[in-house]
Amino acid sequence: AKETLNGTLTVTLDKTSIEEVSEEYTCKLEFNAVERDALGENIPDPVSFTSDSWKTIQKAVQTGNTSKYNIGDTKKVNLGDLGTHTVRISNMSACTNGEASETACGFVVEFADIITTHQFNSTNTNVGGWKDSEMRTYVNGTIYKALPSELQNVIISTKVISSHGSTSSETNFETQDKLYLLNAQEVWNTNDYDTSVGTTK
């Protein structure tokens, strides 16, 4: 039998009597979700974030086998016409039930350099915030589609809480995104109107 990810293979034998002198056994294999996903694939154990494939990284994160990875570890990613860029591990701590947003918990990877430039909106407005912005459409469309398919396949949707700005009649926005931007506090260590600070940490 193939060794499962956690080293345990559950086998249940249902005994069925055919004749007095012969017996037939039905073998039933039971796998957990992680085992089913990787069954039949020979995914190597982790060596380093820089050299491991995205499938190896995904398996390591799913099984909690991340001792070879550290915050700040980097890896090159080819985005085709957008060039080759560097990503790095920015967080490895698990999300807890009390998190208002998932952008700063779990296994988070960020770009360490500037991919390209793009307007937040084509007109001089930020009404609707990140949720309704052309930037969000661009990042989760053009940028996401430029990623290697192996990387796309391991990115999960993330609950993102973003600011409503200086207006007083709105609440913070909530979206589900594959990719998202760093908030002002994370980039400049300060902010003027970012009402999401404290909810995205």
Where are these regions (language model features)?
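Collagenous Gly-X-Y triple-helix signature in extracellular proteins
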Residues: 42-201
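C-terminal, structured domain-capping segment
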Residues: 2-41
